[in-house]
Curated annotation (Swiss-Prot):
Name recorded for this polypeptide: Putative pectate lyase 14
Note on cofactor: Binds 1 Ca(2+) ion. Required for its activity.
Family recorded in the similarity comment: Belongs to the polysaccharide lyase 1 family.
Residues where Ca(2+) binds: 236, 260, 264
Active-site annotation: 316
Organism whose genome encodes this protein: Arabidopsis thaliana (Mouse-ear cress)
Signal sequence coordinates: 1-26
EC number from the UniProt entry: 4.2.2.2
Length: 438
């Protein structure tokens, strides 16, 4: 009897072990890879119209649930008194800013993204590269120690700066894949020349930079990687130009006064989060989508969260075409023409924002449909949920009201618009100092 019980126990143990082994292998075999190839190629040219982009988010409701959990955890920690001196309820900031040793754990930032660009790892898995030289004399053979030398490298890099500096670029700064530009701890300005181009690449993080007074440049040779340089025609003079790229996160930058747009994302770009930025003194702030006829932008998914649209802005906060756009918990304190516009049937999901209309009684409307009559745009899915309208502001909704129509334009759980002031209180490039809370 004892022998029989012993054999039974051993058999049961082996069965449990085998079941666990098979389960682990199944998980490993079905789990999607965390990283993609850093090969600098375009996926846009290989897509047929209407084909879903490989980097677009196929289950945004899952993302919303994940981000909702992070927000709830952030709120729960505040209620318990954790990080009470710095926590704001902003899930991105609460993820890293309460750490006094943030400068020793810079790459933790890559785990704090939310929304459609949440998988942008930047240079997390690479070395640190310290920019020591603000010059930019040769866009084809850049000098080691310069920002241009760093961004063209083929390997992943987390790029930081040795000291405060103003970088005036001679030609557009064309970034290679898997790069983070991290301006925390110093005061870095990219100003008075060309600015940033994110073209046919993936996994880019741009954080903590002052970008302003960008000029049109071009008709010159410019290097885009260690092995390639080529002729560039005239660039528009955008602050950040995103072209045919995916997994992009633009966070805590201050942008103003550029020749064209402050941030443009076009030509099949997707999986983008624009968060915690401070935008001022500009006409056409953010363009999302190339042209009405470029239907490959139907795959575009962009999250715009916790930004402050401030003094001197006129329009395009953002201006959307074709794709899916989640505009959530932003603070709109200034516009002269309109705040959110679009054409070519974009889906716009506006949630928990604060809109303060200008004094001009003809500019109170938040929204603007471009190039279409009411008979056409009345079918476009644009909705406002929980937005706070001040000084006569109003949002003209259209399309179906059912939540299912906004699934692909949902990327995180909105907080109450009454909290927007707190959520956006630190928008723009932060004045972090090493050894203290940021």
């Amino acid at each position: 009897m004892v022998v029989a019980r012993t054999l039974f126990s051993i058999s049961a143990t082996l069965i449990i072990f085998l079941a666990l082994f098979l389960h682990v292998n199944a998980v490993q075999e079905t789990r999607e890879p965390k990283h993609e190839s850093s090969r600098n190629t375009s996926t846009v040219d290989n897509l047929s119209d209407g084909e879903w982009h490989e980097h677009a988010v196929k289950d945004p409701e899952e993302i919303a649930a994940m981000v909702d959990m992070s927000i709830r955890n952030s709120t729960y920690r505040r209620k318990l008194g954790f990080f009470s001196s710095c926590s704001t309820g902003n899930p991105i900031d609460d993820c890293w800013r309460c750490d006094k040793k943030w400068h020793r754990r810079r790459k933790r930032l890559a785990d704090c993204a939310i929304g459609f660009g949440r998988n942008a790892v930047g240079g997390r898995d690479g070395r640190y590269y310290i920019v020591t030289d603000p010059s930019d004399h040769d866009p084809v053979t850049p000098k080691p120690g310069t920002l241009r030398y760093a961004v063209i490298q083929d390997e992943p890099l987390w790029i930081v700066f040795k000291r405060d500096m103003v970088i005036t670029l001679s030609q557009e700064l064309i970034m290679n894949s898997f790069k983070t530009i991290d301006g925390r701890g110093v005061n870095v300005h990219i100003a008075g020349g060309a600015c940033l181009t994110v073209q046919y690449v993936t996994n880019i993080i741009i954080h903590g930079i002052n970008i302003h007074d960008c000029k049109r440049t071009g008709n010159a040779m410019v290097r885009s990687s260690e092995s390639h340089y080529g002729w560039r025609t005239m660039a528009d003079g955008d602050g950040i130009s995103i072209f045919g790229s995916s997994h992009i996160w633009i966070d805590h930058n201050s942008l103003s006064s550029c020749a064209d747009g402050l941030i443009d994302a076009i030509m099949g770009s997707t999986a983008i989060t624009i968060s915690n930025n401070y935008l001022t003194h500009h006409n056409e702030a953010i363009l999302l989508g190339h042209t009405d006829s470029y239907t490959r932008d139907k795959m575009m998914q962009v999250t715009i969260a916790y930004n402050h649209f401030g003094e001197g802005l006129i329009q395009r906060m953002p201006r959307c075409r074709h794709g899916y756009f989640h505009v959530v918990n932003n603070d709109y304190t200034h516009w002269e023409m309109y705040a959110i516009g679009g054409s070519a049937n974009p889906t716009i999901n506006s949630q928990g924002n604060r809109f303060l209309a200008p004094g001009n009684r003809f500019a109170k409307e938040v929204t603007k449909r471009v190039g279409a009559g009411k008979g056409e745009w009345n079918n476009w899915n644009w909705r406002s949920q929980g937005d706070l309208m001040l000084n006569g502001a109003y949002f003209t909704s259209s399309g179906a009201g059912a939540s299912a129509n906004y699934a692909r334009a949902s990327s995180l759980a909105a907080k109450s618009s009454s909290l927007v002031g707190m959520l956006t209180s630190s928008s723009g490039a932060l004045k972090c100092r090493i050894g203290t809370l940021c």
